[in-house]
Regions:
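Acidic, low-complexity mobile loops and tails
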Residues: 1-54, 87, 91-128
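ABC ATPase A-loop
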Residues: 3, 62, 66
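Short, conserved catalytic or interaction motifs in soluble domains
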Residues: 60-63, 80
Length: 128
């Protein structure tokens, strides 16, 4: 199940819920707003973030945009394919275009994220 932030990041818990590993990316809405991505700057494995901290940067022909950590945790993997193929984020924003994986520090932070219905209501109110 995907969860979302008002800043247009998504999070999906991987494997067993008690493992606490989550995959993070930007939403289809965000990639559409940005346009074709030309560069993705990912965090280093082992980096720790608090919820809301800048974790990555995506650059398109239109603009650069920060990607925020939807929850606190430690980066355990990054999507190395994006260095050569940043357009994967456009083509598969919630699939092959994922950005990084976190070991979640506090699973309770996930509960405060938006579900799909709430996120759709949020984006319906935004221009785009």
């Amino acid at each position: 199940m995907l969860k979302f932030t008002p800043d247009h990041e998504w999070l999906r818990l991987d494997g067993a819920p008690d493992a606490g590993i989550a995959t993070v990316g930007i939403t289809p809405f965000a990639q559409k707003q940005l346009g074709d991505l030309v560069f993705v700057e990912l965090p280093a494995v082992g980096t720790r973030f608090d919820k809301g901290a800048v974790a990555a940067t995506v650059e398109s022909v239109k603009a650069a945009s920060d990607v925020y950590a939807p929850v606190g945790g430690e980066v355990v993997a990054v999507n190395d394919k994006l260095a050569a193929e940043p357009g994967l984020v456009n083509a598969e924003p919630t699939g092959g275009g994922w950005l990084f994986k976190l070991k979640v520090a506090d699973a309770g932070e996930i509960d405060g994220m938006l579900d799909e219905k709430a996120y759709e209501a949020l984006t319906a109110a935004e221009p785009g």
